Amino acid sequence: MRRPALALAAIVLASPLAAQQAGAPFTVQETGQGYATLDEAVGSIRMGRGTILIQPGTYHECTVQAGGDITFKAVQPGSVTFDGSPCEDKAIFVLRGRSSTVDGIIFRGVRVPDGNGAGIRTEMGNLTVTNSMFLDSQEGILGGEPTGQQIVIDKSTFSGLGTCDEAPDCAHSIYLANKGSVTITRSRFEKGTGGHYVKLRVPNVRIVDNSFDDTGGAKTNYMIDLPEGGTGVIANNSFVQGRNKENWTGFIVVAAENRTYRSTGLRIEANDARLAPGEARSPAFVASYSRDALAIGDNRLGAGVRKFETR
């Protein structure tokens, strides 16, 4: 008779712990351990590998990943918002691990004194971002490292980002630099507030199946800026350039600052580029400073959009 009593007592004692774990906003999936703050959950993984499940809610906190391979995942995509509160005057997620994955999270309202407040600041390790949103901040995703870093962004939204008024050298919706590659697919860019929508200082790019809607933009510049050149593919994107531009002269601009990377064979094809109603200026769809032979294929260009110009 004592064994059932002991078993019942164990259940009763375990119940508060189980309830605590179930109610924790941040849980490491592999261990089932819950944490009150994201930083505690990140610290528990250390140099290992783990997935942090995040319960629905709005959080005013940030984290620095110092190592390991960590996935930050919303239990319900789109139900988790990190609002303001950057770490190190940089970003809500400052990433210095071996790799990082961000899945289903909203980043909003990030501002820092130097004008480069971002949802994500990647400083080390590969990065994958999927099904996430970056809203109303100085920058969306910023950073990179001088290695063969691989960055992949998929099914994400960038809105209300960028500034040249608050940042000395401008902030952008996405601004990345590495010696590896950046892939951006099935994502939406809209309502920019300055700078470029995508600025990449990388040797290899893949920008495919995205939507760039600049009709609600203000003081924006290029849709895609590859300031040091680069190869790869820009295809199947739709572009609409708005009227409120700081620099309206090109949609895609190659090697405007340096010819660090060869641009020979950069494929730009099957895109659709148009001007917003009432826009009378005539930008180039592609403008190149590189002197390399780009592979510009068939693109659908609306009235007033010129195919190509050499600068």
For the regions a protein language model found, what residue spans apply to each?
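Bacterial N-terminal signal peptides that target proteins for export
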Residues: M1-A7
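Extracellular beta-strand-rich solenoid/capping regions of secreted or surface-exposed proteins
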Residues: G43, M47, Y59-K73, T81-D103, ...
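N-terminal signal peptide c-region/cleavage motif recognized by signal peptidases
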Residues: A14-P16
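Acidic Gly/Asp/Thr-rich repetitive segments characteristic of extracellular carbohydrate-active
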Residues: G23-Q55, H60-E61
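Extracellular beta-strand/beta-solenoid scaffold signature
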Residues: G84-F93, P113-R121, D136-E145, D165-L176, ...
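Right-handed parallel beta-helix
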Residues: Q55-P56, D69, K73-S79, R98-G109, ...
